[in-house]
Amino acid sequence: MTQVRLSYAYGTSNQPLLGMTIGEKFDQACQQYADQDALVSVHQNVRLTYKQLQQQVNAFACSLLKLGFKKGDRLAIWSPNCVEWTITQFAAFKAGVILVNLNPAYKSNELEFVLNKVSCKGLVIASQFKSTNYQDILTKIAPELCQADNKVLNAKRLPHLKHVIKIDDQAHTGMHRFQDLLTAPT
C-alpha cells in the first residue's frame, strides 16, 4: 500500500501571512521603489521603472473593466515572454480577472479546447511565436473575428470569447490594440 503524501506542507510559522492582495502588494512596491527599474526586456529594448509599470498596469486594468470584464472572468494570454505579458498579469490581478496562461506552442485544436474549457472572455495574443502565426490560427477557429467591426466577437466555436487584444503596432479588424488600452484614463 502506498503512503499518501501532501502536496503542500503547512502549519504554524514565524512568518505571518500578508493581509493584502497581490495588486496591493504591487502598489506598495511601486511606491517604495518608484524610480528604480522594475522590468527590463532586452529583446524588446524596453526598460520600465516601477512608476512607469504601475501606470501601464493601472491603465490596462481600467481598460479591461471598461470592456466589461468583471471579477472572476477569465483572460487568456497566448504569447512568448514579453513586457506586455507582465502588464497583463498585474492588470488582471488588479481588476480581479483570472489570468489563463496559454502555452505559446499551442496549435488550433489545443487553443480551442482550452479557451472553451475555462470559458475565456478575452484573449491577449502576440503576433507570432517562432514560425507560428497566432492570428491565422485564431481566425481559422473564429472566422467571425474578421467581421467583428465593433470589436466584440460572437464566434460559433468560441462562444465565451468576446475580446481579442493584439500585441501589435497595427490595427486589426475585430481586435483591440494592446497599446490603445494603455492610454485609457485610470
Stretches found by the model and what they are:
Residues 1-20:
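Flexible, non-catalytic linker and terminal segments flanking ANL/adenylate-forming cores
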Residues 2, 25-49, 170-173:
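AMP-dependent adenylate-forming
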Residues 18, 35-82, 86-90, 107-112, ...:
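Conserved AMP-binding/adenylate-forming core of the ANL superfamily
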Residues 26, 88, 138:
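Aromatic/hydrophobic pocket-lining residues that form π-stacking "cages" and hydrophobic walls in ligand
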Residues 95-180:
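Structural core segment of the AMP-binding/adenylate-forming
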